[in-house]
UniProtKB/Swiss-Prot annotation:
Location of the protein in the cell: Cytoplasm
PROSITE patterns referenced in this protein's UniProt entry, alphabetically: RIBOSOMAL_L24
Role summary: Component of the ribosome, a large ribonucleoprotein complex responsible for the synthesis of proteins in the cell. The small ribosomal subunit (SSU) binds messenger RNAs (mRNAs) and translates the encoded message by selecting cognate aminoacyl-transfer RNA (tRNA) molecules. The large subunit (LSU) contains the ribosomal catalytic site termed the peptidyl transferase center (PTC), which catalyzes the formation of peptide bonds, thereby polymerizing the amino acids delivered by tRNAs into a polypeptide chain.
GO BP annotation list: cytoplasmic translation; ribosomal large subunit biogenesis
Protein's recorded name: Large ribosomal subunit protein uL24A
Statement: the UniProt record of this protein carries the keyword Ribosomal protein: yes
Note: There are 2 genes for uL24 in yeast.
Family as reported in the entry's similarity comment: Belongs to the universal ribosomal protein uL24 family.
Length: 127
């Protein structure tokens, strides 16, 4: 396949370097998750950067099917933690599991004025 744009490199090494050395402001966008079909129909957009207090559904991996609220977003590790998705340690303690947002689907948005402005800026519709 021919290269789509001459302005963007298709070199794997450069793409990986850009991903792993991205500043926090770009990592926010890289940590985006798709919206559920209902939210996609309601707001008219496909994906949003994930944030604390969004409700999500795990759609890939061993924890597939579990739901919960985002308890923390760890930009440095490209990971989010969901409050009900945990594993049990040998001593009986429960610890949260790090998940990548691409393996999640947002089922309920935490809306505030900034999030509403973002949806409108992306060309979405608010009810």
């Amino acid at each position: 396949m021919a290269k789509q744009s001459l302005d963007v490199s298709s070199d794997r090494r450069k793409a990986r370097k850009a991903y792993f050395t991205a500043p926090s402001s770009q990592r926010r966008v890289l940590l985006s998750a798709p919206l559920s079909k209902e939210l996609r129909a309601q707001y008219g957009i496909k994906a949003l950067p994930i944030r604390r207090d969004d409700e999500v559904l795990v759609v890939r991996g061993s924890k597939k099917g579990q739901e919960g609220k985002i308890s923390s977003v760890y930009r440095l590790k490209f990971a989010v933690q969901v409050d009900k998705v945990t594993k049990e340690k040998v001593n009986g303690a429960s610890v949260p599991i790090n998940l990548h947002p691409s393996k999640l689907v947002i089922t309920k948005l935490h809306l505030d004025k900034d999030r509403k402005a973002l949806i409108q800026r992306k060309g979405g519709k608010l009810e």
